[in-house]
Amino acid sequence: MEDFVRQCFNPMIVELAEKAMKEYGEDLKIETNKFAAICTHLEVCFMYSDFHFINEQGESIVVELDDPNALLKHRFEIIEGRDRTMAWTVVNSICNTTGAEKPKFLPDLYDYKENRFIEIGVTRREVHIYYLEKANKIKSENTHIHIFSFTGEEMATKADYTLDEESRARIKTRLFTIRQEMANRGLWDSFRQSERGEETIEERFEITGTMRRLADQSLPPNFSCLENFRAYVDGFEPNGYIEGKLSQMSKEVNAKIEPFLKTTPRPIRLPDGPPCFQRSKFLLMDALKLSIEDPSHEGEGIPLYDAIKCMRTFFGWKEPYIVKPHEKGINPNYLLSWKQVLAELQDIENEEKIPRTKNMKKTSQLKWALGENMAPEKVDFDNCRDVSDLKQYDSDEPELRSLSSWIQNEFNKACELTDSTWIELDEIGEDVAPIEYIASMRRNYFTAEVSHCRATEYIMKGVYINTALLNASCAAMDDFQLIPMISKCRTKEGRRKTNLYGFIIKGRSHLRNDTDVVNFVSMEFSLTDPRLEPHKWEKYCVLEIGDMLLRSAIGQMSRPMFLYVRTNGTSKIKMKWGMEMRRCLLQSLQQIESMIEAESSVKEKDMTKEFFENKSETWPIGESPKGVEDGSIGKVCRTLLAKSVFNSLYASPQLEGFSAESRKLLLVVQALRDNLEPGTFDLEGLYEAIEECLINDPWVLLNASWFNSFLTHALR
């Protein structure tokens, strides 16, 4: 192919193509089809411009022979073929002198007669498909698009072909000749298919035969063929039409489409009120683990055996007492519940054989904590039809809460690395098809970046707790079963490690429907003093239960050990989703994969290796009050994973509503950034729908705060 290109094209064109490929770091010895495509595109641009001039009267004329007496100006300015810096200098100069709007992408030509930039396309596929790709990329009404194909077809914006028929015929003939020459040398098939990497859309989806007839038959009235309809749609101005249609709907509907400008959007209003509180089902950054390395005890792997072994590693137990009461609860009952757990664990140890499960005695404190006999009696509706004042319970509106800094700290912590590995390679699943080693390579790179992440620990902790709780809820419906909160990991040295975070005591669990609730009491170890951020722990009663010796650079120091106790509840459907938290790994991997795909399509080769191994490159992670935060690809992986994990941990109707409604505003802002001149009606109604979801949920409030930072920096 390289020899053919050098023989077929003018040496000046070949030299320009070589420079262009060098500028983009591409090897013409390897990417010979691309070399041919660049030369073809350059030649079409030059042919488009050749012989076209503007005379003294400002008229466009075609002059094939030089007339030394004519004062002629070239009709087209050629931008394609110049190096990027020079090309942008030319574009800026044209914009300054003609008042034309500066394009986002480098165009190929400027037409001084029509005062517009032109994007030339040469395709080996169907012109309509290539035209749409170009239009979607450029997203500008000010750049005129003209596409030629090797089969003699062409397509242009609003069916305005700019040049006379003879000039266009010359270009089409040249393209046809190139095709014939390639075919004679056996190069055409490879060249044609290379535009898409393998089989082209042209081969698979060319609209011919019956499909073409159906397309022509299914057009709206007054359109004779598909091309006419496409040209009409391409030049369609929607706003006035939409306004007209809306005004027909109802006398009350008066939708005036307002332009959406940089100054239009306002920040989302976050609620005032007391600070929001922690509402996750288990502790996150504040959790403390009692651990055993290389477990080899009798019954290893049985949760109760593992828990007792972990409890034996700690020697600093002391008489527990309340340090932060729950404002509305009977706090002595929480204290008594913990003492009961300790006592019953001691009883187990005194037995000859430790049982596999432990059902707690149904004491008054546990009955209170688990809401036993607290549910109102259910009465059949038919038995109370004649009750005159029958009504639903009065329920108070939820109290508005303000954003608190602890939730951002939780998120930051979730993105950090720990010194343990929380997933093995097979957590994401083995290849089920030989979809090539690229898929395995991406999975392995991604796993390496996230396997030590704290968010991954939360996944495995959530999977374990939800699985154990659902199993116990089905197997021991009437029992107050003691469920250890356990996770497993590997140390840096590769040794296995079993961790105990605390215990759950399950209440009665006759779960018939997906949404039926099982109550549980959670008791979790921590070194965090609750008095530092009491608002975070509103729902908890916190006990001090021991002193832990910690080794530090200075030496050993003693820290009080706390137990965070609260009553909580969950349902079958929530536990089912909790068991599937590993999906978060898959979701964030797919997001990373789409970034790799975008990069690969630009470079026209798989960029997986470069993507993960180029440690110097940074990527945008998110918005903060300081602006766009950048980080390594590993940090991007961990941030995306943490977002997915928090969406699972803090799932709620408020989050569903906020995500759906704020996305609409995000799309409008993105359209503005892409210079698409969006218009809106009832924007304030959209803001109301968004702000209606901002009540008291910490994760939703944090997302709203991030959205405001995005608005600030996106519209500068």
UniProtKB/Swiss-Prot annotation:
UniProt motif (Nuclear localization signal 2 (NLS2)) ranges: 184-247
Principal cellular location given in the protein's record: host cell
Location(s), subcellular: Host cytoplasm; Host nucleus
UniProt-recorded Gene Ontology molecular function terms: endonuclease activity; metal ion binding; RNA binding
Keywords from the UniProt entry: Cap snatching, Endonuclease, Eukaryotic host gene expression shutoff by virus, Eukaryotic host transcription shutoff by virus, Host cytoplasm, Host gene expression shutoff by virus, Host nucleus, Host-virus interaction, Hydrolase, Inhibition of host RNA polymerase II by virus, Manganese, Metal-binding, Nuclease, Phosphoprotein
Top class in the EC scheme: hydrolase
Family designation: Belongs to the influenza viruses PA family.
Full protein name: Polymerase acidic protein
Provenance organism: Influenza A virus (strain A/Northern Territory/60/1968 H3N2)
Lineage: Viruses, Riboviria, Orthornavirae, Negarnaviricota, Polyploviricotina
